[in-house]
């Protein structure tokens, strides 16, 4: 915990550094979405084939989040962060040097290992390091780091890839991670493991039907989103017939709209989280259904992307808030499960998009994605009626 001897300025610097780390980790997860065509060209592959790296990355995170969290549950958190950053940086150097697609995938697995540990401990660390009475704002800052990864990280990474090659994008992320590591070493105090939970926590969490229902909702709605989002760059260029530069602009718009979603949730989420999540899922479903019809013009796609970005950010924030509220006694285990389940959804969505693109038509990714979105909408209405009080509680720390 931050003590009385720690100034509010230092406490906020620590949280901001974690938010920057969140920005970097999310940038590297999202950025291949904007680089698929370039990566495919360099290895003489089809774009849809290279998309499998998104699924592999996400499913490695999903499989390893809980085992790694349990293996490191007693490790002092500052040391753990330093070690995972070293792995993260080394893996990006390998991505830069990758001489084959297989080597690139191996390097991404290394990044995924670091990612799996990072996201299982970061939310609870931000809460511990925040100034007194500012824990909700600390979580919001982490969410902002995530949003900025979509707003700036993904499109800037794509621009760097367009002009200097996709390898340079990965190298730049590694350099950014190195600078962030130096800040973490300087700013963070010793952070003994706290409320990390253990294997004993799992049966307790699994006996919470409201929490399990939120996990199921998460995987279904994330699958819906990533079915289309994973292939938005080749969709814009190959299906809509628009320029590579517009694909970059569209990613910028979609990410920027996420900040609007974050602001809306920050204003209304305390008292109306369940309603906001259901409305956002309905909005996501509408955007997916309208993706192909909107592809007739840049203006239509840009407007659709605004609503899409708002929807997915409100969904992500809503899920995280509810998980923290439902598992205050084992935050690291609960968030590790959440990270894993979220990434199962990413991997499933990317795989569905991959199969639709290869065996059907990339033009249909929005329509196919709308199916799990509809199922998620129905499920959200059911569970928010079944556990209305429990699911409106906010995390207490």
From Swiss-Prot:
Keyword Transport set for record: yes
Keywords associated with the record: Cell inner membrane, Cell membrane, Membrane, Sugar transport, Transmembrane, Transmembrane helix, Transport
GO cellular component: plasma membrane
Pfam entry (one): MFS_1
Spans through the membrane: 15-35, 51-71, 81-101, 103-123, 136-156, 170-190, 209-229, 246-266, 273-293, 301-321, 333-353, 364-384
GO molecular function, one term: carbohydrate transmembrane transporter activity
Places the protein is found: Cell inner membrane
Main localization category: membrane
Bilayer topology term: Multi-pass membrane protein
Family per record: Belongs to the major facilitator superfamily. SotB (TC 2.A.1.2) family.
Role summary: Involved in the efflux of sugars. The physiological role may be the reduction of the intracellular concentration of toxic sugars or sugar metabolites.
Protein name per the record: Probable sugar efflux transporter
Species this protein is from: Escherichia fergusonii (strain ATCC 35469 / DSM 13698 / CCUG 18766 / IAM 14443 / JCM 21226 / LMG 7866 / NBRC 102419 / NCTC 12128 / CDC 0568-73)
């Amino acid at each position: 915990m931050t003590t009385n001897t720690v100034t509010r300025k230092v406490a906020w610097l620590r949280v901001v550094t974690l938010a920057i780390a969140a920005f970097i980790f999310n940038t590297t997860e999202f950025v291949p979405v904007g680089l698929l065509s370039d990566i495919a060209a360099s290895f003489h592959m089809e774009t849809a084939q290279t998309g499998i790296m998104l699924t592999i990355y996400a499913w490695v995170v999903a499989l390893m989040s809980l085992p790694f969290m349990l293996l490191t549950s007693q490790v002092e958190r500052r040391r753990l962060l330093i070690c995972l950053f070293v792995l993260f940086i080394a893996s990006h150097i390998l991505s830069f040097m990758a001489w084959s697609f297989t080597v690139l995938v191996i390097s991404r697995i290394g990044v995924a290992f670091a990612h799996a540990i990072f996201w299982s401990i970061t939310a609870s660390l931000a809460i511990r390091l925040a100034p007194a009475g500012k824990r909700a704002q600390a979580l919001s800052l982490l969410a902002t780091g995530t949003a900025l990864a979509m707003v700036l990280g993904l499109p800037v990474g794509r621009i760097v890839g367009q002009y200097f090659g996709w390898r340079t994008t990965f190298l730049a992320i590694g350099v950014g991670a190195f600078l962030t590591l130096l800040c973490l070493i300087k700013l963070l105090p010793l952070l003994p493991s706290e409320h990390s939970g253990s294997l004993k926590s799992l049966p307790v969490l699994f006996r919470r039907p409201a929490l399990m229902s939120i996990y199921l909702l998460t995987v279904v709605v994330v699958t819906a989103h990533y079915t289309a989002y994973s292939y938005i760059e080749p969709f814009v260029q190959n299906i809509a017939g628009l320029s590579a530069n517009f694909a970059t602009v569209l990613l910028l718009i979609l990410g920027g709209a996420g900040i609007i979603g974050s602001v809306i949730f920050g204003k209304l989420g305390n008292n109306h989280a369940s309603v906001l999540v259901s409305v956002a899922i309905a909005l996501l479903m509408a955007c997916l259904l309208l993706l192909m019809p909107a592809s007739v013009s840049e203006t239509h796609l840009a407007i659709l992307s605004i609503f899409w970005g708002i929807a997915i950010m409100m969904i992500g924030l809503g899920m995280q808030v509810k998980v923290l509220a439902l598992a205050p006694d084992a935050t690291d285990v609960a968030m590790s499960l959440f990270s894993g389940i979220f990434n199962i959804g990413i991997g499933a969505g990317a795989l569905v998009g991959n199969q639709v693109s290869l065996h059907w038509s990339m033009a249909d990714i929005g329509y196919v994605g709308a199916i799990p979105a509809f199922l998620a909408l129905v499920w959200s209405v059911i569970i928010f009626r079944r556990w209305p009080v429990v699911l409106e509680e906010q995390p207490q720390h």
